[in-house]
UniProtKB/Swiss-Prot annotation:
Organism listed in the record: Mus musculus (Mouse)
Chain residue ranges for the region called Segment S10: 1005-1025
Residue numbers carrying Phosphoserine: S711, S724, S728, S924, S928, S1194, S1197
Protein name as annotated: Calcium-activated potassium channel subunit alpha-1
A Pfam family per the record: Slowpoke_C
Membrane topology: Multi-pass membrane protein
Main location: membrane
Known outcome of mutating D427A: Does not affect sensitivity to Ca(2+)
Function: Potassium channel activated by both membrane depolarization or increase in cytosolic Ca(2+) that mediates export of K(+). It is also activated by the concentration of cytosolic Mg(2+). Its activation dampens the excitatory events that elevate the cytosolic Ca(2+) concentration and/or depolarize the cell membrane. It therefore contributes to repolarization of the membrane potential.
Complexes and interactors: Homotetramer; which constitutes the calcium-activated potassium channel. Interacts with beta subunits KCNMB1, KCNMB2, KCNMB3 and KCNMB4. Interacts with gamma subunits LRRC26, LRRC38, LRRC52 and LRRC55. Beta and gamma subunits are accessory, and modulate its activity. Interacts with RAB11B.
Feature: compositional bias, Polar residues: 25-39
Domain RCK N-terminal: 407-549, 785-929
Gene field: Kcnma1
Amino acid sequence: MANGGGGGGGSSGGGGGGGGGSGLRMSSNIHANNLSLDASSSSSSSSSSSSSSSSSSSSSVHEPKMDALIIPVTMEVPCDSRGQRMWWAFLASSMVTFFGGLFIILLWRTLKYLWTVCCHCGGKTKEAQKINNGSSQADGTLKPVDEKEEVVAAEVGWMTSVKDWAGVMISAQTLTGRVLVVLVFALSIGALVIYFIDSSNPIESCQNFYKDFTLQIDMAFNVFFLLYFGLRFIAANDKLWFWLEVNSVVDFFTVPPVFVSVYLNRSWLGLRFLRALRLIQFSEILQFLNILKTSNSIKLVNLLSIFISTWLTAAGFIHLVENSGDPWENFQNNQALTYWECVYLLMVTMSTVGYGDVYAKTTLGRLFMVFFILGGLAMFASYVPEIIELIGNRKKYGGSYSAVSGRKHIVVCGHITLESVSNFLKDFLHKDRDDVNVEIVFLHNISPNLELEALFKRHFTQVEFYQGSVLNPHDLARVKIESADACLILANKYCADPDAEDASNIMRVISIKNYHPKIRIITQMLQYHNKAHLLNIPSWNWKEGDDAICLAELKLGFIAQSCLAQGLSTMLANLFSMRSFIKIEEDTWQKYYLEGVSNEMYTEYLSSAFVGLSFPTVCELCFVKLKLLMIAIEYKSANRESRSRKRILINPGNHLKIQEGTLGFFIASDAKEVKRAFFYCKACHDDVTDPKRIKKCGCRRLEDEQPPTLSPKKKQRNGGMRNSPNTSPKLMRHDPLLIPGNDQIDNMDSNVKKYDSTGMFHWCAPKEIEKVILTRSEAAMTVLSGHVVVCIFGDVSSALIGLRNLVMPLRASNFHYHELKHIVFVGSIEYLKREWETLHNFPKVSILPGTPLSRADLRAVNINLCDMCVILSANQNNIDDTSLQDKECILASLNIKSMQFDDSIGVLQANSQGFTPPGMDRSSPDNSPVHGMLRQPSITTGVNIPIITELAKPGKLPLVSVNQEKNSGTHILMITELVNDTNVQFLDQDDDDDPDTELYLTQPFACGTAFAVSVLDSLMSATYFNDNILTLIRTLVTGGATPELEALIAEENALRGGYSTPQTLANRDRCRVAQLALLDGPFADLGDGGCYGDLFCKALKTYNMLCFGIYRLRDAHLSTPSQCTKRYVITNPPYEFELVPTDLIFCLMQFDHNAGQSRASLSHSSHSSQSSSKKSSSVHSIPSTANRPNRPKSRESRDKQNRKEMVYR
């Protein structure tokens, strides 16, 4: 052949070794060496001269001159007589298939369009003829046309059926379609792998189809691709668009060359690299298999598949043109590059590094690189950083929680911020909780910021964070919610829309309960009325530990209790918050306050040594010997038909005998101290004086070894499982305390509804709001005294506070009717109308429309004579600047403190609010202050306006002028609600609090004049470790709200009146908080230098009163007299703590049945007849004893200065 001869001549001319007869073979071998680095791999297809060819090839590699002379157009072994390259045949098969099909489609569309146009014109002609012929000939002439239309319809139906069948076959909506799609993708990857294997061979080589295994596999794959292509073509609605799709183009340039290779017995690597474009569908395949479910994972796989497929495809094109050469250069400028070297070349090109060790030599290769570098650089710069970011984030907060054997975990979700998490962890992981073997898993859909991330790292041994949502079951499975000990949901206390926040948390509860109904959930709620929605969840069960901590209910309940005993809100808030003991050597008020702050509330089962003893006896023994303060026990009724078998009784009195397994509620500094009540043994510890030596003794070890005989108690969550006695508490109580005595039953009027249906609250018939509204002139003519003034900021668009939660504790049924403090609301009438629906069933409530910033309104309601002024705002969360959220409350507080009052107010009894402890002498009328409700003639209208005041009959106690002690607004008892803790610094201008001081360390909070909702955050962890703590707090704070009452309010949104029955009246028999003054009365001798322990024992033994704290003047420790009237709270002082005469003692007082038997009378008379109007009262002042020794003069001066201090509040 001509080309062969040319090659031979060149070979001999160059002086190459070998005879002239081997010139053709040498030329062929040199060309084969130019096409591939491994020429010997192709020599296996030659006949008997393979060994000589191999040796000739190896010798010719070292002849550099031959490369310039040889024209590499023949193959290693000629497949035909001429030895021509046939790459054009492979390429032509693909081009003919593509353009031929495209031409047919376009031709078909053109003919179809012309046919449509012609039929449209013909249809108009036939329609005109049909109209002209008339309807009489329609049946005969149209019959053949109908037959044709039926045939056409049948044909269309058959084609549609085939098309639908093909669509179902390739659709991923059916199992067959999914299997087919996955199979096509897998075979495409297999064909790509075969291409990788064949890329080590020359671009074009002779292959025997019957002997080449890879060619046979590739042929089978492509036959399947051809069938799948046919299905896709049939199912396609737009054939032209289908023909131009990427997957179709891939099939055009990969399937036909395989059939050509079988016909020609040769293989051309060609465009088989286009199979790499199938990798773009990788994310779709994984979605079909339900492997990819999240948006981030889908996006990551999409980016990776597009990047890799583009990279591999471009590398295949460079490999083809560089190993083949330029056709117009007769393929002389080729270079031998492996496929993976081309992959490397494309990567350094996309990254703009370009080392230069590998580069394109052909013109086609360089031209391709010019265009590829533009798109490749853009793709590299955008895809790679995004891929790295997705991979980094996924590794950081993705994945699943791995449970540790023997260690519980809880899931915390909801409002996850730096403030909420830090407050939660500070309380949950406090050292006073003993060993907390619980891991905390936070789940939130937003990744934490740097500060929050640093907080998680500081607690990495016990805290993990996962990004996700509790509304997604997949994320719940990731955090192992089914094996979690509990799930805690935090709320955003500062949100602008509390109802929307509650709705979000309720949806979280629904999602979690739907995934795992048995999980224990503790959630925060902002609005009280939204708690009713939790009752609609079938798996919500408060008896199994599910709890909803309503911040509005508890916040207003704490404030209401401060109206009865100022400072109680601070004391209770400190009790369920974990605080470390801070020791101060200086004799300042902070020293005594911080000693009380370190106390918390714990529960522990009582030792068997206490069995058979009364509650006061056990309480005294614990206080004196064990240095523990027990305030309540858990009572479990033996009556199985009772609606609530298990109750918590606070200071139940001496009628109760304790049995085995009684759970006690203690106030102590840490959990280890409380264990003394469980380990105490009379035989071993009776003579022990140091309470630290009371530990587990031999007697208790013998008891523990005995097999249990009763069912085990519920676990105690003080850091793990507790070994406790196995008996249920059985409390024996005399019937007269469970059901009122005969005298009280006789006095009941069964036809009058005084209490609600549960008997827990005072009730009256619903009143219209117009009947309780006072104008400013009417209020100015009304002398109000001993009342509660509620200053409320709000308007028609403000979120509701829920004032019912403030009024309910003040209307608890354990007060007698005449003991109820009148409540006067001062605020916007538009706002109060929205709240009135929940308030219209409570007695003694009035409204003065106005603003708390108006001094005229404040003077009209006699704010200087009130027992407490409460300042609330419903507009706090509508301001973006947190420092301005409390501006209204702060301005109102400062406005009241700056007011001055004159001496024109009448004379009132100094101790008009005094209580006499039950059991004292009430027979003398001189010891019973008279409470009169008088009407004074109005100057303007002449009608009788009620004067709500408390008058005392002149007796042994001196008369003082009230205005002498409250001539300044600074002496008005006040409590202000704050949203932002740091704003507490603005309430007292004379304090020295640092702006960075924690809230509980500030003077306004310690004095009980400020309250912030943030202190309630500690209830989440306290409730988790002991669910009884929340029940006790709610019992103390809400005045007796129960889950049954909440269900009733959820049904009717109001209290329902009920008749007085022995069962409902029995609910009145419960303790209430009061304040005992040491200025006068039976404890006055202990007030001057006496010990707190002696007072504790005397009050408990004599009057069944349980003392638990002191409300002391701030400067009482100073030797010099002070004009400051501020007080601070001392929680659970020790036995030897010294008392001062001005102290007020916090105590739990028993309900007195007989105190309210004599009815209060209303006298409608003039102001001059005040002294003759009387009504008996349970509010007794403690009489001065005649034989009490005279006090020193300094004491007398203090008596006169503090005569306003009441025996009880």
